[in-house]
Curated annotation (Swiss-Prot):
Keyword presence, Protease: no
Binding site for Ca(2+) 2: D125, D127, N129, S131, E136
Keywords: Calcium, Luminescence, Metal-binding, Photoprotein, Repeat
UniProt-listed InterPro entries: EF-hand-dom_pair, EF_Hand_1_Ca_BS, EF_hand_dom
Signal peptide: none
Protein known as: Mitrocomin
Propeptide: 1-8
Record-stated family: Belongs to the aequorin family.
Source organism per UniProt: Mitrocoma cellularia (Cross jellyfish)
Amino acid sequence: MSMGSRYAVKLTTDFDNPKWIARHKHMFNFLDINSNGQINLNEMVHKASNIICKKLGATEEQTKRHQKCVEDFFGGAGLEYDKDTTWPEYIEGWKRLAKTELERHSKNQVTLIRLWGDALFDIIDKDRNGSVSLDEWIQYTHCAGIQQSRGQCEATFAHCDLDGDGKLDVDEMTRQHLGFWYSVDPTCEGLYGGAVPY
């Protein structure tokens, strides 16, 4: 299955970049639901399925599809069920995931983040028009707890609306998240409107 992306992204990694490290440290702490300095796949799935999907009103089928994508994505970074992962293990797992995902993207192959994006868009695209509006984006980010202010949501939306049509498609979101989380693409700086560093 080919991604067929319309958008180029920086394909080289910069794992020593303080911005890349700060972004992932922020998310590690955000995802550490019980604040014990360790995370596991149980916590990811609980947050994704029992909190976010439930708040968004996802169907059982949508929740199962989304959960599989979360399992595959975070599994790609080395997370497992019932096995705690520390920060050093987490960041090393992200290095492996980033390399693998960028390699897939460079070959026009489907990435785990794209599969997750497809599953997520199916849930948040409430009017079923194949794109996400600003209001749909705001609802999702509030349910996920990533962004709380409208300004942060609007900043991310504008940053991801690469074709300037006032709506987001999954290709735009995938491209920006590849650049932000994997390669520190300078065109992706400020992606989360300040909710996530840099």
